[in-house]
Amino acid sequence: LALASLGLLASASTQAAEDVIEGSEGIVKPLRFSGFATLGLAHNNNATAGAITSFSQLKPVQQGWSANMDTVLGLQLEWQPLSGTTFQVQGVARAGENMQPRLRIAALRQQLGQGLNLNLGRMRSPLFFDSSIAEIGYANLTVRPAPTIYAAVNSVASLDGADLQWRLNLGDASLLAQVFGGRYDYTHRFNNFSPAMSADASLSGLRGFSLSANLQHLTVRVSRTEIDRYALRSEQVSQINSGLNQLSGALRQMALNPLLPPTMLTGLQTKAQGLEALRNPFDNRPVYTSVGLDGNWQQWRLLAELTSMDPHNDLVGRGTGYSLTLARSFGDFTPYLSLAQLKRSSAKLNTSALAPTGLDAQLDGALNQLLQGFDRAQQFANISSRSVSVGLRWDWRENIAIKTQLDLVRTPNTNTPGPLAVPVLPFDNKLRLFSVTLDMVF
């Protein structure tokens, strides 16, 4: 298998993921092999929109049945040559990405002292509460973290850099502080084209922290991540930049006319500067904030998270969201109800520089074409949506769970695609997704 050629896999970067993947026996082994898998089928009732778990997914779940939503295989290898020194490798293949192996972890973990650990290399993403276990179906109570708020951050599956973790045990409670920094590159999919197009996404200057409090029946985590530059490059972006440069050059050439009145001269120069400012329109400097909790009381369990993403880019738009899951166990069976919503809450991109000049019909026609393109891009950049999910988890065997889930997803209107794969607007903005999964760890 292609996955085996990676030399695969290691434990997930958080303690919760380690407990799921590696067990809790605490036995030190020089070489440990383990993994996780989900065999899933999902049915989409919508002919105009596909379902995705991330914006790096190659093959959305279109109308009908598909394994592309949740089917995944993860293998991991951990080598501990010395006490306190561990090498980790983890690879994952997803059906939605043609089962091509992706390296999620390739890191050195070094214990520096009591409760203090340093990780160097590629690690699991720390952006949101469940980011580190999002692909491990068995570790999630539900079939998957709600794409309503997780589709954007699931694209950033890993971090290439370093993190420092300090754990302090206080009786039956503990505190975990984490600081991290690095970069990450991936292929971003624009499903608003038919066929879909790809862009090279590069995140540099990524840094942040998280603080977790683990009590007997409650875990609370707060995190904040800042990214200096989130750049998207593709043939389409290059074409946009080229068109803006040509129009800006034409305006500056017109401004050289000595017969123009000063007010018109200033207006043309300002308009040229405005066009140049629209280059690389998807580049942003996002800040991700998350406050999450996982609590249980007797047979009840509550999962909740508040999230915020401020891209400092009016085309992408700021978003605030939440997810809430309530479950109750009846022996091996756990029915649950989940709610999630993401809402855009920022101003629209200023495209006044694309207004007609009234001086040249050909130039004004080109400006209008770009204006229509930017208006369309703003529509597709709005990932606002809300979802209601009901499901049932059956812990059938040790380390094996079977789940069924019905998701009702809705975007604000027929011209807002949300986190869906929508090639044409307007579209049917209500999607019903039914999923059945078999999750396991080994």
Feature-to-residue mapping (PLM):
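Cleaved targeting-peptide boundary
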Residues: 15-25
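Outer-membrane pore/translocation modules
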Residues: 42-62, 142-147, 155, 184-198, ...
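N-terminal signal peptide c-region/cleavage motif recognized by signal peptidases
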Residues: 11-13
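Outer-membrane beta-barrel pore domains
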Residues: 46, 133, 236-442
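Transmembrane beta-strand segments of Gram-negative outer membrane beta-barrel proteins
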Residues: 23-55, 432
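Residues that define the transmembrane beta-barrel architecture of outer-membrane proteins
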Residues: 29, 67-73, 100-104, 156-160, ...
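Outer-membrane beta-barrel domain signature
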Residues: 22, 60-66, 94-97, 149-155, ...
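Outer membrane beta-barrel
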Residues: 30-44, 64-187, 212-219, 328, ...
